[in-house]
Amino acid sequence: MSAQPLLQVKNLSVFLNKNRQSFPVVESLSFNVFPGRTLAIIGESGSGKSITAQSLMQLLPEEHFSFSGEALFHNENLLDRSNVTTRSLFGSKIAMIFQNPLISFDPVFTIEQQFHEVIHAHLDLTNRIAHERILAVLRETGFQDPERCIKLYPHELSGGMLQRIAIAMALLTSPDLLIADEPTTALDVSVQYQILQLLKTLQKKTGMSLLMITHDMGVVAEMADDVFVLYAGRMAEYSSVQEIFHSPAHPYTVDLLASRPSQYRKQTFIPISGQPPHYTHLPKGCCYSPRCRKALPICFEQPPQSTPLNAHHHVRCWLHG
């Protein structure tokens, strides 16, 4: 990869402070998001995907969470809450859309009023130019009649339409990086596909980077250039989407791929047995060892370190250590 990373995360750890104890819910994550490319972070529910994304946006309350490591974006550390310059990046150079679009909107204000709130916070535009900008981004996201749309309240729109509006709102400031936290999970299957295609089209048009949070390997196959497999808040595997699908190295990655429905297997899918560990009761060795069909004795005793299989493929597994 010749280009410099737009976002460079180094040894990110997130600790939940509870009952006078500190639990590492995310530990020592390192990954890059490159200009114009999509990095997908995939894992089961409870793997730490959303915690990772929210920590980058400073959305986790300091009274309950503490952080270590760096997340460098335009030479600013996104984890530094005392830096005014860093805070100014959120909503302008970095935007985020969420799993449930309804929670992104205030029910007592029209869509237009909420667009103007974003503009007043981040852009210096006259009311006329702001209005034109709102209509333009709504047209870009597929609205045929944006004038009518902006007069409506959130409850008057479907989930798919609200997610399109959330994307349009994120695009108002022409961000360099869009973080999409499970953006299609709460939507119907046909609408999911439309939203994914919209994101791909907008990315190609604007050149923005995408950090996609998902539990769905189908979304990864459709959207990602690079893939970061996360389990129990720890990196399992990190590589290009081609290597993840064609040469998966970690048993968890293999099991995720096997758990997808397929018309080419006699058994349409193979579920992963057991449940991910709770952050308060993590296994002594590899966090995946209790569920792993290839576990070695050492897997239950010592956590593996990251091993490079090549320049762009890393795995944490004793099978490759």
What positions do the PLM features span?
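Conserved ABC ATPase "signature" region
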Residues: 128-148, 257
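A short, proline-enriched helix->beta-strand linker immediately N-terminal to the Walker B motif
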Residues: 172-176
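Hydrophobic anchor residue at the start of the ABC signature
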Residues: 115, 167, 191, 195
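P-loop NTP-binding/switch modules centered on Walker-like glycine-rich loops
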Residues: 179, 183, 187-268
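Short catalytic/signature loops enriched in Gly
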Residues: 5, 147-148, 238-321
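Conserved ABC transporter NBD signature motif
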Residues: 65-77
